[in-house]
Regions:
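The AdoMet/dcAdoMet-binding core of the Class I SAM-like
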Residues: 2-7, 52-126
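Class I S-adenosylmethionine
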Residues: 1-67
Length: 127
């Protein structure tokens, strides 16, 4: 797998937005030309569903085991890989911004292994 493509519609919630954009040669990479989903905070690009983003997460996804803590929901790219990993017992995602949750969570794959908490990671205390 070279890319985890998300199925999140365009939208705005507070200072966050999801946009579909056509890209060619993204950030000077050999990214295939096509439409990509991008999460923005104000006008700052936070995350996209590109092969580059997947490569940045690949080692973590391959090595994950036990009870996994994910700091930030982003586009929810890691959810499906983690929940389908037989070495992962549970996935706890801590997302600081309710606006990101409102835009993304309903469109993410999830099962009984995955739970989402709205909190700043440094303020959150595990059960």
């Amino acid at each position: 797998m070279n890319r985890i493509k998300v199925n999140i519609p365009e939208g705005v919630s507070g200072d966050f937005s999801i946009r579909k954009q056509h890209m060619n040669n993204f950030c000077g990479t050999e990214e295939p030309q096509g439409f990509y989903t991008i999460l923005y905070h104000n006008e700052t690009h936070i995350m996209q569903d590109t092969t580059r983003e997947y490569r940045e997460h690949k080692q973590f996804l391959n090595d994950a085991h036990g009870n996994v803590l994910v700091t930030g929901l982003g586009l929810g790219l890691v959810n499906e890989s983690l929940m389908n990993n037989p070495n992962v017992e549970s996935v706890t995602i801590v997302e600081k911004y309710q606006e990101v949750i409102d835009l993304v969570w309903n469109h993410c794959p999830k099962n009984d292994k995955v739970r989402l908490i709205c909190a700043a990671i440094y303020d959150w205390k595990p059960d």
